[in-house]
Structure formats: C-alpha cells, structure tokens
Amino acid sequence: MDARLTIAYYIKTLAEKYEDRPAIYFKSAFRTFSFSYRQMYRRSLGVANYLAQKGINKGDRILVWSYNGQEYASILLGCALSGVVVVPIDFGSKADFVRLIAEKVGARHLFHSRRRPVPQTSLSHLCVEDLDQELAEVPIDKTDFGVREDDVYEIIYTSGTTSDPKGVILTNKNIVSNILHIAEVMPISSDNTCLSVLPLSHMLEQVPGFLYPLSFGCAVTYLHSRKSTAVIEALRRHRVSIMVAVPIFLSVLRESILREVQARGRERLFRRMLSLSSHLPRPARRFLFRAIHKKLGGRLEMFFTAGSALEPALEEFWTALGFQVYQGYGLTETTTAVTLNTRTHQRTGSVGRCLPHQEVKLGPENEIWTRGDNVTPGYWENPEENAARWEDGWFKTGDIGEFDGERYLFFRGRLKNMIKSAAGLNVYPEDIEPVLCKMPGVKDCCVIGLEEGGDIRVHAVILLEKDEAWDNESVRSMITSANQILQPHQQIQGFSIWPHEDFPRTNTLKIKRGPVLQEIQQGKPAGGATRDNTVPQSSGDRILDLLANLAKVDVQTITTESNLVSDLGLDSIARVELVTMLEEEFNLEIDEGAFDAGTTVSGVKEIVAARQSETLHYGFRRWSRTWPARVARRLLQVVAFRVPSLFSRTTVKGRENLAGLKTPAIFIANHTSQYDVFYVVRALPWRLRKIALAAAADILFELKPGDSWGRWLYVRFCGFWATLLMNLFPLSRGSHVKRSFEYMGELVDDGWNVLLYPEGKITLTGEMDRFKGGIGLLTQALQVPVVPVKIDGLYSIVPTTDPDRLRWIPERFGRVSVIFGKPIQIDPQADPDQVARTCEEAVRNLS
C-alpha cells in the first residue's frame, strides 16, 4: 500500500510545504475570512479528533448538509484524516431525502447548516456555524488514524430518483490518483486563485475546484451566495484567475454580455471584433476585449468545464474573448476527469484526450468504457447495479462517444437518452438541441422520445424567451427551419411549448429529462423549476421554513397573516438577516426597506415574488482609500483638527486601553454633535488613524431624481470634501443597510478601522439614546474587536435641538472629554439584541 495515495498524507504534505500561504477565502455576508494551509490542516485535525471524541471511528459514516465554506472543507478533510466516511448531501435537498440517506448508510452523525431544519432522526448533529466554537474545546490528541489508500473516503449519491438513489463509493486512491492525473497534464502556478460556484457535494467541485488547485499552493474562494452580483464582486475583490463551471454558467454569462452589448447599440462592432479576434494571439484578444475582462475582475484567465456538453459555438465565443476554456469528461463514478483538453492538446468540440494512467475505449453502440485507479469500486449495497455496470474490469459509463483520428473524444449523449427511430437509426438529443437553441426566441429546449402509435417520435419541448410572443404556427415554422439544418434521421416530428419559467434541473443545472417526459405524457405539471431570479410557485413553504427558523417558532404556528414584528418578533436586527437569507435562497435582489413593522408573511411572499429592489441613489467612494487621498487627508487634518481648540479644551482618557489593540477594529461612540468625529479621530494614536467614518446617507450622499440644483451642489461639494477630509462613507438609516454593511466588511478586509454611531442620530437632549439593534448583527459578522468611546461635554457647547437643522456655531467655550474603554470581543453565537445592549452599556458606563 502507498501512503502517498491517501488524502491524509496529501493534506499534511501541502500544509508542511505551503504553511502560511492562503488556502481558503470565505466571503460571508459582510466580510472575507482567510485560512492558511497550516490553519486548514489544524482545523481538519480538530474535526478528526472531534469525531473520535464522539466515538465515531474509521469506517463509520457521517452526513454533511451545508453550504460551501471553510467549515465544509474542514469536515471533508477531517473525515479524510480520520478514516470516517463522509456522505455529502446537496444543500438543496429536502429533509426527507437526508433522512433516507442517513438510513441507507447507517449514518452516525450529521453536520448541517442552521439554515435547514434538522431531520427527525436519532442522529447526533452539529450546526456548521457552531463548528469553530466546538473545535476550540477539542484537544488535538491524535494526528495519525492509520488511513490506507483503499479505505473508503466518501459515498456520493448521484442525481437519480429520490426513492432509490445510488451511492457511489470513492476511496482515497480514487481521489488522489485523479488529482495526480489532472496535475500531470495541467500544471498551474501557485499565484492563482480559484472561485467556487459549484456545491462541494459534487465531485466536479471537490476535485478540480478544491483539491486540485490546493495541490499547487493556490487559494480557493467560497461565497455565502452564488448570486451573479456576488460572483462578479468576488472576481474583482479576490483577483480570481480560475473557475470550474458547468456549460450553462458560461452560457448565462455570455447572454449577459450580449444583452449589455445590445443595450449599448454595439452589436455590429462587437461581431466585427469577434471575427477579428480569431486571427489574433490571446494577449491581443484580451486587450481587444479588455472592458469585459475588467468587469470579470481583470485576472480571470481560464475555465474548466464539464458536467454536460459544451457547444462548440459557446467555446469559440469565450476563446475569442481571450479566455482559455478546457473541457473535460468524467462522472462521479470516475472521480471526475477521464479525458481533458489541455494547453498543448486541445480540439474545439471535443472533451479532450484520455488522461495518463487511465484507459478509454468504445463498447457496443459506441458506449464509453473506462478503467483506472480513479474508477469507483462500486455502488453502496447495490449488487445489481454493480453487476450491470462492469464487464471484464471495464466500467460502462452509459455515455455515447466517438474518437477522431488523433484520439480526441467527442461526447454524443447519454445512452438512456438515445432515441431509436422507426427506421432503426440512433438519434441523439444532444445533436438536435444545439440547433434548436440557436433559433430566434428559443431560451432552451429538451428533446425526448415520445411514443405515438407504437413508434418513438423525436419530440422537442421548447422553452421560449420570456419577452417573445409566439403561437403554434410560428413555432411550427421555426421547427421547419431547424429541420432544414438537421440530418434526415434527426427530423423533429412534434413539439410542445414548456409552460413553466424553466425546466426542472439538477444541482449542476442539467435538465431533468424524466420529469419533462412525464409532464408531456400526462399533460400536467411534474413540479418544474424556475428561471434564475424568479421564485417557484411552491416558495411559500421555503419562506415559512426560513421565518420559523429565524423567529425560533414552530412553522405550523405561522399563517399568511402573521406579522413579522408583533407575531414573529422579528425586529430591526432580524431585517438584514431575513433579507440575506431570502436573497440567497431565491437568488434575488431585495431591498431591506421593503420590510417594516406592518409587513405580514403574505407581504414577504409578494415582495419575493415581485423581486422588489429600489435603486441605490449613491455610491461608495473607494478613491478615498487611495494613497493620494490619504496623504491629502493627513495634510488637511493638520488644519481641521485645530478647529475644536477654538471653542473647547479636550481631555483624553483611556488611551492605555488602545495599547495592545489588534486592528482592524470597530469604534462605537455616542453621537452628541457633528463635531464628534473631529474629537474622536484627533484623540486616536497615529497608528489607529487608518479609519473610515459612517455618515447618514440621506444627509451627505443621497441624490434622487427630482432633487434641486441646490441639493445637487451640496452633495457634490460638501460630500466630496467631507469624504476627503474624514474618509466618510454612506450608512443608510432606512433601506440599503445591507449595502452599507457589505462596504464596512470590505473596509475591515482591507485593514481599515471603522467609527460608528449606533444611536443612528445626533441626540436632541444631551442624553444617550438606545443603540440600534443592527450593531449587534454587524459586530458579530465582522468578528473584530469593538472599542467603546464616550464623548462628554460637547453637547453643552454645540447643542442640536432641531433634527432638521444641524448646529455648527458653538454657544460657548467648554471642556470635552473623549474616553476610550477596553476592547470588547463579541461572541458570534450570542443573541444580536443582547450584543447591542452590551455595546450600549459599555459606552454608557464610561467615565
């Protein structure tokens, strides 16, 4: 046995080699956390020892039902170190399916997200959000668990029927050998960053998207949301250079680019540029389309794609833009890649050549057969399937392909999808669908074999563009046009217009042909899915589950008329959290201002269905953090900080509490005057003056349609100078709080301190008001020290009694005290409202 073919050896070696190099970035709702190779290994050892403490040992099975992130990665690797068999469950699965899999494999434990209800089982379980807190109590007693290369690492349940799913067994040797096979033909440099957009429950993400880039010392970025806006922002912030994606992702991204080109009236110019680029070297193509590259982060270079067929036209489009697209072929049963296009051996339209140390041949009916160390030893407790899928040591993939003269493999479709025509000829839907999809007005299509009069007929199910108006005659004419392109045996003999927003799809966005065929045969819905950015008709249950989870009440007690505040107890703290959960669950953009004290559950459903989102009437001035702005700020502050000396004498207390402060940090202060910021920043030591200050968006930053010229000049002039002088940024006091919170996360990620006034407004009485609940949620999410600051005496010098009129002229000369308290470390698992009260008392009690 070769210890080098275990994931345990693999991960330990990487930790020793790359040590403090970043391995994982995780973008939470508001900020990004980084974990080095050494930290990743230690966390994984923590998971291994946690399982051992639970009496879960080598060969036992555990489930993971969560979103992508550093916790998921730690659990996967912790199981690899301990020999415990991990069974990943797709995060979109229902609780009943989780319970079914738990019974099938005899699971001992469940790691799950608190975003999902715990299945009614006797399993012990732990929320992944609590994993760090749990691991802090676990001693690392053991580092070698005796894992061998043939030990089972995981069982992956493929997207078959939920009544009888198939569990694919994968060993350590399967995983590591496949990584080595890919790495041998596609080495990459360690300065690359890979962005994860596929679920870790899928092998395409686990190997090419996670373990393969780690083998070269690269970093992998995980997102709390896979919305397009979050993906684009991650590409920019993390300078992503590699993505592993399914073809439909590339197709959707292409359509987005083409829509923008059309909106700008540049279609003809764009087509000419595409035509020209085919004759240019790749650097020139990247320069020609530099605006697109800039939008996608500027450093994105290559896509690895598999999971379904990549249309040659789609591949040529991205290649023409200057990107590298490498298509491969593989299955869960083959631990992903069997063939792959590479830098030196690539052919458009093919899925590449066979990887080293593997074998591929074509069996009867051109079925792809393969064998190698990467191929599964079999299905979990399924002898019938095991007997059917192997022959003389060869694994029968169920896919159809053909080789060209240079042994490039071309994928032709699934054997089970093949339609046997009345003439006895083989018809492959995958050959027909690209032709149909090129027809004007066709969003997508699914070709099936429909039985009529004892014969199997080629039937097209067509999803039309939302804005297109079609009748049957128009569609029939379009089918005729397609048939003129298709071969005689491929002729479409009938069609249906798909009535739903989208086809039902797998977690990798492939169309589920079974439910489509069922609906066409029965003439009734089979539970279709929805387009991106729209809500399924069955979304009510999902919304109720989220609300019940957030409000900590029984879902049965919630009705459509339940009020978010009076019935469910969701105050302003929960508003941002609810919006974040809804946006991620339904892939929407929702404005927090849509929810108020009068919103009911039915109102939430209407808001989600309508995808209401107000326009943001201000931006965040990132130029204020550049070096020229910082130098100018220091010079201006030399003069500005003398102004308070004209009407006050300042005493600073508690500076010793800042001596060992680890930055970045959040400073929270009471709000007595618009001069507060001058006193607080001037009182800070020089090393802490890398700080950004929150200011009310509606006062200094917000411009709305219809605003007067006076308002426009005020915002442009005063907003500019205030931003330059004090590095102010807009904080919404109504809607768009989440945007401001995200910007604060960006500031903290870049090492900036932040000054906040949690009261949300200047006091009109001189007494400190209660802190807004959002400060609890924010400080928990940012996970940095919180420093309480109290300003005393300034209100009596510059009192504000009218909220609509800010006072700038002092009434008298006086004494002002600025008091710094001891930094507070916020418990991320505490009640956010209690955190807000703790922060409030910390400021109130300073003297």
Spans of features found by a protein language model:
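Conserved pre-ATP/AMP-binding loop-to-beta segment of ANL
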Residues: E19-P22, P139-Y157, D164, P187-T193
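Conserved AMP-binding/adenylate-forming core of the ANL superfamily
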Residues: I24-G69, L77, K94-R99, G146, ...
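Conserved ATP-dependent adenylate/AMP-binding module captured primarily in the ANL superfamily
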Residues: N49, F91-P119, E137, N178-L195, ...
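AMP-binding/adenylate-forming catalytic core of the ANL superfamily
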Residues: S93, L110, L362-P364, G372, ...
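Conserved AMP-binding/adenylation subdomain of ANL enzymes
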Residues: V176-T193, L200-R290
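A cross-family acyltransferase "interaction/gating" segment
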Residues: Y222, F720, D749-L755, G760-A830
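Conserved AMP-binding/adenylate-forming
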Residues: A284, L288-L409, L415-M418, K438, ...
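Conserved C-terminal "lid"/linker of ANL adenylate-forming enzymes
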Residues: C446-G449, T480-V535
